[in-house]
């Protein structure tokens, strides 16, 4: 079962949309490092309406902002060494924007907390959820947070002001039943907000592999207005599209073996679209973010 966050505004993508097969590096790409023009194992990815990219850098313990066309980024959270201080992060895995409060909300994974950090000129964060081994999170339009609990194999919803939250997926020990999850990474919430006792497999579920019916280490996921599922299939170094009700997916970018060429990926983690339908991928082991421009969108 695959779950992941809504990234920015909802997207309208034509069912026959195609993307350029060669990506453009829009963040990092200057080898692994902690310079402002470098990334180190980018994972969670958020693209704002103006195509500004926010990247969670696990190894550098920071969140960086890369504006459209920039050759270097700006640290907007963390970056003060690994630690538990209010001004520090430890292996952050995801970050989203709360536009209403003009702040970042960050999965500070190794500190087992979710923190809110002022988006502009913030020097420290505020812990809003404690004691949670979170990997991914998202927010619906009502301001409720959905956070994955990796250790407890569950997803919890936190309405505004709540500190405990409610289990909305999994929470029945780890396993492969439809009412179970196994080490969930990222979570996506659509506009339906329905909560069910059992899930429905919408992609994969046929064992690990590289057939079009299979996934291997699925990471980032986005769902469009038609219910089409887009999956960062990290273990196969490709991005796949699964139309609603489909029994197999199709490769939309990557799938050319693991590598650092512009048509290749190496453990694709985060996944996002901008409002035009252009695709962004956190290419983790290449320490870069790749943009694949949309060629056709109806």
State what each model feature region is.
Residues 50, 58, 100, 109, ...:
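Short loop/turn segments immediately following the C-termini of beta-strands
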Residues 266-298:
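Blade-level signature of beta-propeller repeat domains, shared across WD40, Kelch, NHL, RCC1
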Residues 194-195, 212-245:
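Loop/turn-rich, solvent-exposed surfaces of beta-rich toroidal or solenoidal domains
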Residues 48, 98-100, 140-142, 190, ...:
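Structural WD40 beta-propeller signal
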Residues 8-41, 70-93, 120-133, 162-185, ...:
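Gly/Pro-rich loop segments of beta-rich domains
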């Amino acid at each position: 079962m695959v779950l992941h966050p809504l990234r920015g505004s909802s997207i309208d993508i034509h069912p026959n949309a195609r993307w350029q097969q060669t990506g453009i590096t829009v963040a990092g790409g200057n080898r692994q490092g902690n310079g402002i023009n470098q990334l180190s194992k980018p994972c969670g990815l958020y693209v704002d309406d103006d195509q500004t990219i926010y990247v969670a850098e696990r190894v550098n313990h920071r969140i960086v902002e890369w504006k459209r066309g920039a050759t270097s980024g700006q640290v907007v959270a963390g970056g003060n060494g690994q630690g538990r201080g209010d001004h520090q992060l430890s292996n952050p895995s995801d970050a989203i924007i709360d536009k209403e409060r003009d702040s970042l909300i960050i999965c500070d994974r190794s500190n087992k907390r979710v923190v809110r950090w002022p988006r502009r000129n913030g020097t420290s964060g505020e812990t809003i959820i404690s004691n949670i081994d979170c990997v991914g999170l998202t927010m619906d339009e009502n301001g409720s947070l959905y956070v994955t609990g990796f250790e407890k194999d569950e997803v919890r919803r936190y309405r505004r002001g709540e500190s405990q939250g409610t289990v909305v997926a999994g929470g029945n020990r780890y396993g492969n039943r439809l009412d179970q999850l196994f080490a969930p990474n990222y979570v996506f919430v659509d506009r339906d907000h329905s909560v069910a006792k059992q899930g429905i497999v919408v992609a994969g579920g046929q064992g690990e592999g590289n057939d079009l019916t299979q996934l291997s280490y699925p990471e980032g996921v986005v769902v469009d207005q038609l219910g089409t599922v887009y999956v960062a299939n990290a273990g196969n170094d490709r991005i796949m599209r699964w139309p609603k009700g489909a029994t197999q997916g199709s490769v939309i970018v990557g799938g050319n073996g693991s590598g650092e060429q512009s048509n290749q990926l190496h453990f694709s983690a985060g996944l996002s679209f901008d409002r035009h339908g252009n695709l962004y991928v956190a290419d983790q082991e290449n320490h870069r973010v790749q943009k694949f421009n949309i060629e056709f969108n109806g």
